Amino acid sequence: MKRFDELYEELLKATIDNREEEYIENLDAFDAHQLDCLLNPKKHPLVWSTKSCECPKDDRHCVKVCPFHAIFPDESGQLQVDEAACAGCSYCIQECRAKRLTASKDAISVLRALRSHKGLSYALIAPAFLGQFKDVTPGKLRTAFTKIGFDGMLEVALFADILT
């Protein structure tokens, strides 16, 4: 059976390469719930369980650290996330010793939306990316965005200049 991270990486690459349907048709030995989480992230909580929890019932750090009491064991002892209560703070993910929790992944649904959208789509970025990604120039970033389906890129600072 494919691990969650393998399924995500392969599906993301297939989506980028416009081979998503072919990939899914040929997929075997996978967790259907994990695939549904990746294809339809809005139908699932902000935090996903990628495997069954095997922590002792009285020593689940993820449950203890959640300030919103959004993660809890169900009747069978498996972890559930209350979608309404979860704020996506990721404390539970950081505290999961077995690394069986992950944050919602929406890159695939964004790529699908870009491809099906009629009209122009621009990536709006903060100028802080220059300090965060030293080797990435605005030109490289713009090229990357256009390769995945955006029509262009605008820095949000441009709008601040226009409005002031």
Predicted regions, residues:
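Iron-sulfur-associated redox domains of electron-transfer enzymes in respiratory
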Residues: 1-15, 20-22, 104-164
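Ferredoxin-type iron-sulfur electron-transfer modules and their immediate structural context
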Residues: 1-65, 69
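Fold-independent oxyanion-binding glycine-rich loops
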Residues: 23-26, 69, 83-84, 99, ...
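Short, glycine-/Ser/Thr-/acidic-enriched flexible segments
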Residues: 28-31, 42-45, 87, 128-130, ...
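Gly-rich Lys/Arg/Thr-decorated short loops/hinges at beta-loop-alpha junctions or inter-strand turns
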Residues: 41-47, 90-93, 122-125
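N-terminal juxtadomain amphipathic helix
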Residues: 44, 48, 52, 82-84, ...
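Charged, low-complexity surface patches
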Residues: 55, 85, 133-137
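Iron-sulfur cluster-binding cysteine motifs and their immediate structural context
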Residues: 57-82, 87, 91-107
